[in-house]
């Protein structure tokens, strides 16, 4: 539908159907107007500079957008104007000193919280208390993605095991480091459960 460029890492669907994309080397968030009549949109309707943008998550309860960059979590307001979209920063939350290069940001299934990973640490951000909490995990550094599911689902983690490359792996593991999936030759950067996401979407939707 669009070619954002700048090494897109994540995308999120906004309540009006528009799509926001995080591009890391482009250092920006791009909002594309969704039009069911068009098969391709050449340009974003809005862009916002975000250093090394890797992630973006819609928070349905608060009606806001979240993105983690460097050692900060940013809370963004969306104006809700489908044909003239805009994002503005509302607040920033600082992580502990020494954190760099935020990677993943993902809702915790069944909780009012999100996992945040940086090059050095993994946190759970309590959205109601607005606090970063430490997480018990087999490895704190360079976690590329974390994904949770309903009861009975393991929390799945992707961390690089690729030697000379520092971003991919052929396997997915759980929070204790146990291997859950492995395929020789695969280069996995991000692993997600394909499940409903009540943090961002209503129970009945068409996405």
Go through the PLM ranges and name each one.
Residues 21-25, 65-71, 114-119, 157-163:
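Conserved beta-strand positions in repeat-built beta-propeller and related beta-rich domains
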Residues 5-14, 50-58, 95-110, 138-154, ...:
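Repeated scaffold domains used in trafficking and secretory/extracellular systems
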Residues 33-39, 76-86, 126-135:
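Short loop/turn segments immediately following beta-strands, especially the blade-tip
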Residues 69-113, 118-119:
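Eukaryotic tandem repeat interaction scaffolds
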Residues 1-2, 39-48, 88-96, 131-137:
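A short beta-strand motif characteristic of beta-propeller blades
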Residues 8-10, 16-57:
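Short N-terminal edge-element motif at the start of the domain
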Residues 30-37, 131-133, 151-207:
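C-terminal closing repeat unit and adjoining cap/tail of repeat-based domains
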Residues 27-30, 73-75, 122-124:
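Structural signal for beta-propeller blades
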């Amino acid at each position: 539908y669009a070619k954002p460029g700048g090494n897109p890492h994540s995308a999120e669907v906004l309540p009006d159907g528009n799509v926001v994309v995080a591009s890391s080397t482009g250092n920006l968030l791009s909002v594309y107007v969704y039009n069911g009549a068009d098969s391709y949109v050449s340009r974003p309707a809005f862009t916002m500079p975000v250093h090394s943008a890797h992630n973006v998550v819609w928070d349905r309860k608060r009606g806001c957008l979240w993105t983690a960059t460097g050692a900060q979590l940013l809370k963004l307001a969306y104006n809700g104007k489908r044909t003239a979209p805009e994002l503005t920063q509302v607040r920033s939350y600082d992580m502990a000193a020494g954190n760099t290069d935020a990677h993943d940001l993902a809702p915790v299934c069944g909780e009012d919280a999100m996992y945040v990973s940086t090059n050095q640490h993994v946190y759970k951000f309590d959205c109601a208390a607005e606090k970063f909490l430490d997480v018990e995990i087999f490895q704190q550094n360079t976690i590329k993605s974390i994904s949770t599911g309903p009861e009975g689902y393991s929390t799945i983690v992707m961390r690089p095991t690729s030697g000379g490359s520092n971003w991919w792996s052929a396997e997915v593991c759980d929070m204790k480091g146990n291997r859950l999936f492995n395929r020789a030759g695969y280069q996995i950067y991000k692993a997600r459960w394909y499940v409903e996401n009540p943090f961002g979407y209503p129970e009945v939707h068409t996405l």
